[in-house]
Amino acid sequence: MHAFFPRLLLLLLFLPLTHCTYLPSLPYKIDIQQGNVVTDEMVAKLKPGMTRSQVRFTLGTPLVMDIFHGDRWDYIYRTAPGGRVAEEKKLTVFFQDDRLSHIQGDFPQPPAFSESEPAQNFFSPEQTFTPAPDTDSNMNEEPDKKGTVNFLKENQTNFYKDNQ
């Protein structure tokens, strides 16, 4: 009987410690997010014929830009909430002649990609673009007699004679 009470006391002391292994919140595990967050709304804004800069503005910088596949951008988003099984979403964007041609991935196809006619003009009619002035045509003109080039040509021989 004397040995029974100390054993019972030890059992009662260590019993609460065994319950710590059954608590799911201990230890705390953080949510891990990797890659680009791409939503259905962002994918719905994509239209065939968009430029690379327009796609980058809409979706953000791609996670993978492969040098061997220059006309393909990959957007990958992976999340592991609280140590649970990771979820992964992928979106691959394809370009042809630097214009968006089609997309693949875990997102529904936007309505614009089901149409047969690709969108051509993304700028409003008010926007006009004027080319930069041609500065190369001025390079071929001969400077006048009082110009710097003629002055240097005339004084070049005198300069070298004086410095020898």
From Swiss-Prot:
One of its GO terms (biological process) is Gram-negative-bacterium-type cell outer membrane assembly. Keywords: Cell outer membrane, Membrane, Signal. The keyword Signal applies. Disulfide bonds: none annotated. Its main location: membrane. GO terms for cellular component: Bam protein complex. Residues 111-164 are annotated as: Disordered. It is found in: Cell outer membrane. One of its GO terms (molecular function) is protein-macromolecule adaptor activity. Part of the Bam complex. Belongs to the BamE family. This is Outer membrane protein assembly factor BamE. It comes from Nitrosomonas europaea (strain ATCC 19718 / CIP 103999 / KCTC 2705 / NBRC 14298). The gene is bamE.
